[in-house]
Amino acid sequence: MNNIIPTQEEIAARVKALESILIEQNVISTAMVDRMVEIYEEEVGPKLGAKVVAKAWTDSEFKARLLDDATEACKELGISGLQGEDMVVLEDTDDVHHAIVCTLCSCYPWPVLGLPPNWYKEPAYRARIVREPRTVLSEEFNYHLPESTEIRIWDTSSEMRYWVLPQRPEGTEGWSEEQLAELVTRDSMIGVGPVKTPA
């Protein structure tokens, strides 16, 4: 069994091949593909999650509500929908880092993170992140955490969808929510990557 998570290039090549076949067979059109991409890039997905994270970084009362009941707190910002009925947000600290996985399939909080990345659905990721999280984070995602940081893995399911509230980067005091949201990445809300470094 191959335990190596496919590279983004390998995944992209597979997707492109499948897309070409479906277009050639008139199952879908390029306009349909473009529209679906636009929906998940602009109307659903990581940009919305980044908006929630930035709000939590700047509003302690909202952050408390988010950590208490993420589903309801997200609704305050107009964010809800399929695959986001029961969400729990996990706060990263200096001592504890969280990462999410669905060991059974690919359950994922779509309203805030969009479509799951292909690697998230791969059996290798689903098995290895549970057994050897520090190794997977460093070798597969080039994300190196201090040895003193405890890594907790959360198994998301159809009943409960977890996602991560990453730590606010230093040097962002006085930044607007819009500026802060630009630093938040999808991978930081999954727990497999950092937020962007402030410029």
UniProtKB/Swiss-Prot annotation:
Binding-site list for Fe(3+): C102, C105, S106, C107
Record keywords: Iron, Lyase, Metal-binding, Oxidation
Cofactor(s) demanded: Fe(3+)
Record note on modification: Oxidation on Cys-105 is essential for the activity.
Entry keyword Lyase: yes
Modified positions (Cysteine sulfinic acid (-SO2H)) in chain numbering: C105
Ranges in coiled-coil conformation: none
Recorded catalytic activity of this chain's protein: an aliphatic primary amide = an aliphatic nitrile + H2O
Record keyword Metal-binding present: yes
The protein's Enzyme Commission number: 4.2.1.84
GO MF annotations in UniProt: nitrile hydratase activity; transition metal ion binding
InterPro entries to which the protein is assigned, alphabetical: CN_Hdrase_a/SCN_Hdrase_g_sf, CN_Hdrtase_a/SCN_Hdrlase_g, CN_Hdrtase_asu/SCN_Hdrlase_gsu, Nitrile_hydratase_asu
Regulation: Inactivated by oxidation of Cys-107 to a sulfenic acid.
Domain of life according to the entry: Bacteria
PTM-bearing positions, type Cysteine sulfenic acid (-SOH): C107
Cofactor detail note: Binds 1 Fe(3+) ion per subunit.
Family, as annotated: Belongs to the nitrile hydratase subunit alpha family.
Function of the protein: NHase catalyzes the hydration of various nitrile compounds to the corresponding amides. Industrial production of acrylamide is now being developed using some of the enzymes of this class.
Subunit structure: Heterodimer of an alpha and a beta chain.
The name this protein goes by in its record: Nitrile hydratase subunit alpha
